[in-house]
Amino acid sequence: YLRPNFKGNIKKYLVVYFGPTMLLFLSGAFYFLIFPQQFDSQLTTLQSVTQQTTTLTPSSLLLISVLQVIIIGPVINIIPTLGEELGWRGYLQPKLCQVVSDRAALVITGVIWGVWHLPVIIMGHNYGTDYIGYPWLGILAMILFCVSLGVIEGYATIKLKSAVPAAMIHSMVNASAALPIYLAKGDYNLILGPAIFGVVGGLPFLLVAIWLLIKVGKKPAINS
């Protein structure tokens, strides 16, 4: 699963490279469609960032951030994410596929991945500590997000017989998951969004994951 298997799979890799990024933008648009009052057209958050760190205007910084996500998001964190994905998608998922269906393996791997985040969620990473239902709602939200993202990454792993595409998707998410927050006013609930690890912000990822689970069906186990 360390080999990228580029030969004959360039079109699939283009989908892996750009598809999740487009899904990220769709997720942000979806969130602000549901909560239009939280959209900050004045880019207040970015204004505070630019005043402290750069001479760029907020709109220029936003444009640069978006272009960075599109162009280098899938590879900027590829080394650490590949190390992690070799464990999740390169080892655990194929092992599970030897005893359960591919569909079940994708979901179980995602659940375990989500539970693995439990300590940092309790520490307040991603969702903070001041929300109703702390820390259980945060844990459940993270598990839901990890299942959604894990199914997408796992499906790419099955199709390309490599953990590299999963690492690329993971890299993009690490580089850009919180990007929609820069477009939001300060009264949002991180359990809901606007970042993609929120329940509403991540709904497009969940819908794609459900579609992929339907596609993968109960097929023979992946050969390790």
Predicted regions and their residues:
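Membrane-interface helix/loop boundary segments of multi-pass membrane proteins
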Residues: 82-115, 154, 158-162
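Residue-level hotspots within the lipid-embedded alpha helices of multi-pass solute transporters
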Residues: 69, 77-82, 114, 142-146
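Hydrophobic alpha-helical membrane-insertion segments
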Residues: 14-31, 109-112, 152-159, 163-170
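Specific transmembrane helices
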Residues: 1-81, 178-224
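Functionally important transmembrane alpha-helices
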Residues: 103, 107, 130-192
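Transmembrane alpha-helix/helix-exit interface in multi-pass inner-membrane proteins
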Residues: 25-37, 84-85, 106-126
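Membrane-interfacial alpha-helical segments at the cytosolic side of multi-pass membrane proteins
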Residues: 92-100, 125-128, 179-184
